[in-house]
Design a protein with these regions (language model features):
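Long extracytoplasmic/lumenal interhelical loops at the membrane interface
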Residues: 299-367
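Hydrophobic transmembrane alpha-helices and their immediate junctions
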Residues: 19-22, 268, 366-407, 436-438
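Transmembrane alpha-helices of multi-pass inner-membrane enzymes
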Residues: 42, 399-462
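N-terminal signal-anchor transmembrane segment
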Residues: 3-9, 17-84, 104-113, 170, ...
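Membrane-interfacial helix-loop-helix modules of multi-pass inner-membrane proteins that assemble, modify
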Residues: 113-119, 150, 154, 162-204, ...
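Aromatic-anchored transmembrane helix interface
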Residues: 70-71, 93-107, 117-145, 154-156
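Alpha-helical transmembrane segments of multi-pass inner-membrane proteins
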Residues: 152-178, 199-259
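A membrane-periplasm/extracellular boundary helix in multi-pass inner-membrane enzymes
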Residues: 168-172, 257-301
């Protein structure tokens, strides 16, 4: 083991395994975190850059998940050769917290598939959808284990590197003149006027992820890092502008500023009120769409839903707003759309929608009334309250901000199972909780040392 330690970790070695043998697990867990070799950081940034730039290299779509498995392997190997388990408890707690909905989705889906005698290829597709997000969760837990709060920095660097590559690719294909002209028109029109060069920058999933990074920079970072990260995230968020993401970002920022200025007790009350209100709104939103009232409202107000109204109407016969509605399992909506599109039935014959562009209703259809109720409650109340009790108000508020932003995008898009937004969504609170813990431990060490230093000074003076 020491030989492996020297090969993989250089001077950092595998001394913790000796401590484990001599002092036991509890004493070992009290030791300082082992320093990480610099090349691990660069390896992670490189892997994330390729993962976020997946399509630009002409690589298979699943390459990003292969690289995320690589991050997991890198963390496991480092732990194996160093015996450093210090961050595992916190990382494990978050893994369970974020993993619980995936377990619920898999269990309910398997039950529904069995009752409906579904085909094996349909069931495997639903399971793979859940598995991909378990991989993303494992990768982000591994990144936080390796780098602590700095994992946010390194992930952002990878995202920026990927988007820079996308920008350079657009310039290469369309020319610098077309790019500059399109960028000026894009900025003047507020994201409405685009040419081919700017259209190439509209990377939906990555743009939503940059929105989360910008949200974190504005609400949680302080000092020079806040300005730098807000500038980087804001630039790429603007270039890939998604209007619903912008609405979500502005709404969360204003609400965050309001909550942040309140006292802790008031903050706890506000979290509870927001969660109750959000649960009611989500159920009300599903009812409006299923009953057809939503379409009546948007038609009366002459709002352009870009075809969503017709899509919602086509699904009205598929589900009911009732406690007796049990759902169809994960992946049903996209499969239904694919079958109807191939058959050219109704609105599906006019356009390939790809998804329902409303993941709140999609989750209701796939999980059923009670599965949806659990998902909504857990998202808005269960995990946020748990975070508050275990890791403090700041981590809980960050998770609340992310949830508000996420659900605003769910209302008009297919982001629940987007890879990049979920990767960043899971990363931020884990890294922040670890950062708060380690900062508190460091502060405690200094406080314990100060009395000893004062005593030594008194002895010298006497």
């Amino acid at each position: 083991m020491p030989i492996l330690g020297k090969l993989f970790c250089g001077k950092h070695g595998a001394a913790n395994w000796v401590d484990l043998a001599e002092a036991g697990r509890k004493e070992m867990l009290k030791k300082d975190i082992q320093p990480r070799p610099a090349y691990l950081k660069w390896a992670y940034i490189g892997m994330m850059t390729i993962a976020f730039w997946n399509g630009g290299l002409g690589l298979p779509w699943f390459t990003k998940y292969v690289l995320q498995v690589g991050v997991l392997g890198m963390a496991l190997l480092f732990m194996l050769v160093t015996g450093d388990f210090r961050r595992l408890k916190t990382v494990g707690q978050f893994a369970v917290m974020f993993g619980l909905p995936f377990v619920m989705m898999a269990a309910l889906s398997m039950l529904y598939w069995a009752l409906d005698f579904q085909q094996l290829n349909y069931m495997s597709r639903g399971c793979s959808t859940i598995l991909y997000h378990v991989i993303s969760l494992s990768a982000m837990c591994s990144a936080v284990y390796l780098f602590g709060r700095r994992s946010i920095d390194y992930t952002l660097y990878g995202m920026c590197g990927a988007n820079c590559c996308i920008v350079l690719g657009s310039i290469k294909e369309n020319g610098i003149g077309a790019f500059v002209t399109g960028l000026i028109a894009f900025a003047k029109s507020g994201g409405i006027d685009t040419n081919a060069a700017i259209k190439a920058l509209e990377v939906h999933d990555l743009t939503f992820a940059f929105g989360l990074m910008l949200l974190f920079a504005l609400c949680c970072e302080r000092g020079k890092k806040r300005l730098l990260y807000a500038a980087l995230s804001g630039l790429f968020f603007f270039l890939g502008l998604k209007r619903i993401a912008l609405i979500g970002l502005v709404g969360v920022f204003l609400m965050g500023e309001f909550i942040r200025r309140r006292k802790p007790k008031v903050q706890s009350i506000l979290i509870l009120l927001i969660s109750i209100g959000a649960i009611v709104i989500c159920f009300g939103y599903v009812y409006l769409i299923q009953s057809g009232l939503f379409n009546e409202i948007v038609h009366a107000l002459e709002i352009d839903t870009m075809g969503r109204d017709r899509l919602y109407a086509a699904f009205q016969e598929v589900y009911d707003f009732s406690p007796a509605f049990r759902g169809y399992g994960i992946g049903y909506v996209t499969r239904y759309i694919s079958i109807m599109t191939e058959a050219g039935v109704g609105v599906f014959g006019t356009h390939n929608f790809g998804g329902m562009h409303n993941d709140i209703v999609t989750m209701y259809i796939e999980l059923g009334f009670w599965g949806f109720a659990f998902w909504i409650w857990y998202s808005w109340n269960g995990r946020i309250v748990w975070c508050q009790k275990e890791f403090g108000m700041q981590t809980a508020l960050l998770l609340l901000y992310e949830t508000i932003y996420g659900f605003i995008t769910y209302a008009t898009d297919n982001t629940v199972f987007y890879c990049y937004i979920n990767t960043v969504f899971m990363l931020l609170p884990i890294a922040m909780a670890i950062g708060e813990q380690e900062q508190g431990e460091e502060k405690g060490k200094h406080e314990r040392k100060e009395p000893e230093t004062s005593k030594e000074r008194r002895v010298v003076a006497s």
